[in-house]
Regions:
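A short secondary-structure junction signal
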Residues: 66-67, 94-96, 102, 123-128, ...
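Residue-level recognition of short, solvent-exposed, well-ordered loop/turn junctions
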Residues: 55, 107-109, 215, 232-233
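N-terminal non-catalytic cap/leader segment that marks the start of a structured domain
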Residues: 1-80, 173, 238-240, 258-277
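Structural signature of FAD isoalloxazine-binding scaffolds in flavoprotein oxidoreductases
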Residues: 73-92, 108, 238-243
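RNA pseudouridine synthases
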Residues: 59, 109, 113-138
Length: 277
């Protein structure tokens, strides 16, 4: 089932998509409230409302090699390497990716993302997927030069709109062997499978839960395959994940970029008005 978070003229809602219709829900984990609306009449928003965004770095061996970070001897990591992105990074499918003036090396990392359904703390890998609401596509946008030069990754990973997510959640999906592809201007740049992860989704979630409580709506990015590369102003980037669909965004000059923070109701409403003119 595809679950969407959307904007209509009476506010922001959650719903389930069946064909071209959305059945409105009482909340992210809610029940149908008797209202329906055509999918064509709404603006889709990022399908999550996280308090925290947790990311896995270097979860594909070939990506470690392409970054030149493979340890001497070729040993793979024994534990997931984690970092955080601020919730200010969250944007949706169709939003622009801003190219900041302070970086000369903006890069893409296409990823499978996980949205948490219920509070999870200290769970096993066998239990972990029971706490998942659904799966979606994401881009971990990275200012690679600042990631490498700064003491911490805050500037390199957490600028505004550096985490496009969408277009919806797929709630009935096995994440263990899915195709993950990233295209830039129609050319395939990344072509991997989740079965190539060093740490599968269930293990990642269980590991995080040992020391950090994840709550309903939180977002976990599970790592990127090899093939990451540079973005330029005007580029169209698409992340296609088997069983989910396609996340699509365009890179724009920072001063020209159009995007809405996930809780920016004024900007979201203006966008809906502009779409219907």
């Amino acid at each position: 089932m595809r679950r969407v978070r959307y904007l209509s003229y009476d506010g922001v809602h959650w719903g389930d998509v069946d064909g071209g219709m959305i059945t409105r829900l009482s909340g992210m984990n809610g029940h149908p409230d008797g209202n329906e609306i055509p999918l064509s009449e709404v603006a889709l928003l990022p399908p999550c409302e996280p308090a925290i965004i947790v990311c896995v770095g270097r979860n594909y061996a070939e990506h470690i090699r392409e970054l030149g970070n493979m340890p001497q001897g070729g040993d793979l990591p024994s534990e997931p390497g984690l970092f955080l992105k601020g919730v200010n990074t969250l944007s949706g499918s169709g939003d622009d990716i801003p190219y900041p003036s302070w970086t000369q090396d903006l890069q893409f990392e296409g990823e499978l993302a996980v949205v948490i359904a219920d509070t999870m703390r200290d769970v096993t890998a066998d239990e972990a997927l029971d706490y998942v609401l659904g799966y979606t596509c994401a881009v971990d946008v990275t200012a690679r030069d600042k990631q490498r030069s700064d003491l911490q990754w805050v500037r390199g990973k957490s600028a505004d709109a550096f985490c496009p997510v969408g277009p919806w959640l797929e709630t009935d999906l096995d994440p263990t062997d899915l195709s993950v592809r990233t295209l830039v201007n129609g050319e395939v740049k990344q072509d991997g499978r989740t079965s190539d992860m060093i740490f599968p989704v269930a293990e990642v979630l269980a590991y995080i839960s040992k020391f950090m409580t994840l709550r309903s709506g939180d977002l976990v990015l599970t790592g990127t395959p090899d093939g990451v590369g540079k973005l330029q102003v005007g580029d169209r980037i698409e992340v296609e994940i088997e069983g989910i669909g396609t996340l699509s965004n365009q890179v724009a000059h920072e001063s020209d970029a159009s995007f809405a923070m996930f809780d920016d109701r004024e900007e979201l409403s203006a966008r809906l008005d502009a779409r219907d003119r």
